[in-house]
Amino acid sequence: MHRRCSSTPHVGVADARDALSMFVAQLNTSIDGEFVFAGINSDVAPMEDYFGTPASAAKLAVDAAFLAEFGITQSDPAVANITAADMTTFLDGAFAALFDDPAWGANWSTASDQDVSSRISPDTVIETGTNANISPFRKLAMAFTMMADLGGETVNDQAFKVLTDKASVIASQGIHELALAQGDVGVDQQRIDRADRIMSLQLDTLNQGIINLESVDPYETSTRLNQLISQLEVSYAVTGRLQQLSLVRYI
């Protein structure tokens, strides 16, 4: 069987492994101890290092699925005998299922589907950001894993073409969906910016009110208050006399 140059797949696999590791690291981004893509589970990193030690749950799940499908591991030289048709069946079946629920939540991500909610005005609450469970992230993880850990160093040309073609399609879909998700986040950011401007104006108004109160002459205020009290006392006295006159008239 004709084989391509052995160095070619190694280059592709190495790049894919680096890309998968960078992808996981980005989804584990944290700010002030809170993980940005974890949803409301923001105190826990949503993803494990796929190639970490000990092996991640995702890596173990992929290994188990590959072994169950082909009866060999990804590093077995017999991977060269996997046909294009068999690889297609695996990618569309058992492998794809690893990125759907419940497998995704069990093996890949501890993120919550519920995003963090923030009150941006007295009567407006919005979900801010997104989480590692959305479709584009799953598709990118799938594409990187196809190239990084399905025997790309050893598979024959036809099976390798199945891997690269499928990974390219899935990655393109993921990138497109991610752009749409970024647009949604951008809309939320605009709402937050608008709320910030409104709250800034409100704060300026309150600060000006405090300044105005602090600039009032205490003596003048006291004098005016005493005058008001005196006026009230006179009013009560007059009212009382009128009531008495009314009673006298009708007794």
Predicted regions and their residues:
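Polar, low-complexity export/assembly segments characteristic of proteins
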Residues: 21-24, 28-177
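Amphipathic alpha-helical polymerization modules
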Residues: 1-45, 151-251
